A protein has these predicted regions:
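Conserved active-site segments centered on acidic
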Residues: 2-75, 79
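ATP-dependent NMP and nucleoside kinases share a basic, alpha-helical "lid"
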Residues: 76-103
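Conserved small-residue
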Residues: 14, 58, 84-85, 132
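Short glycine-rich anion-binding loops that position phosphate/pyrophosphate groups of nucleotides
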Residues: 15, 89-92, 111
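Short glycine-/acidic-enriched loop or helix-start segments at secondary-structure transitions
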Residues: 19-21, 51, 92-97, 116
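Phosphate-binding/catalytic loops
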Residues: 95-161
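Alpha-helix boundary/capping residues
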Residues: 61-62, 88, 159
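Structural signal for conserved beta-strand scaffold positions within catalytic alpha/beta enzyme cores
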Residues: 9, 41, 86, 105-108
Length: 161
């Protein structure tokens, strides 16, 4: 068996968008073949806990994410990744950079954690889940193992729909 395709999903707080991205990559990657994809997430300024609306949204889609904690980008420094995906919103926050990945792409999304009213927060998290779900499905449909770095970057950026 070949080594799994390793993906790191980065944002600032690692409490919402990147956690949802990691969860989708882990669960849908496993559904397409055990060991095909390994995903982690981290943040440049990790929050104290995963946003409860992220956990709730994932649970509504059958993904149990209880007990996870945000990680710092420092926690994964030195690890090798085939693809790094930043999901922060360029307009409102600085996206972290992770050196040494084979390819890095940006899938910018507004931070759903900025919504404080419960109905608006649930709506924002659902929209984030839906956007990442479409992108992850499109990414996992690619022949990831056979793409060189330039083709991987181009293809992974193209699924940012």
């Amino acid at each position: 068996m070949t080594a799994p395709f390793r993906v790191l999903v980065l944002c600032t707080g690692n409490s919402a968008r990147s956690q949802i991205g990691e969860a989708l990559l882990q669960t849908r990657g496993a559904a397409r073949g055990a060991g095909r994809v390994t995903a982690l997430s981290a943040g440049s300024r990790p929050a104290p806990r995963v946003n409860p609306y992220a956990v709730e949204t994932l649970a509504a889609h059958g993904i149990q994410w209880d007990g996870r904690t945000p990680k710092s980008i420092d926690d994964v420094a030195g690890e090798a990744f085939d693809l790094v995906i930043t999901v922060c919103d360029n307009a409102h926050e600085a996206c972290p950079y992770f050196p040494g990945a084979r390819a890095q792409v940006h899938w910018g999304l507004p931070d759903p954690a900025e919504e404080t009213e419960p109905a608006a927060a649930r709506h924002a998290f659902a929209a984030t889940f839906d956007a990442l779900s479409r992108r992850v499905d499109a990414l996992l449909a690619l022949p990831l193992e056979s793409l060189d770095a330039a083709a991987l970057r181009t293809a992974a950026q193209a699924v940012h729909i």
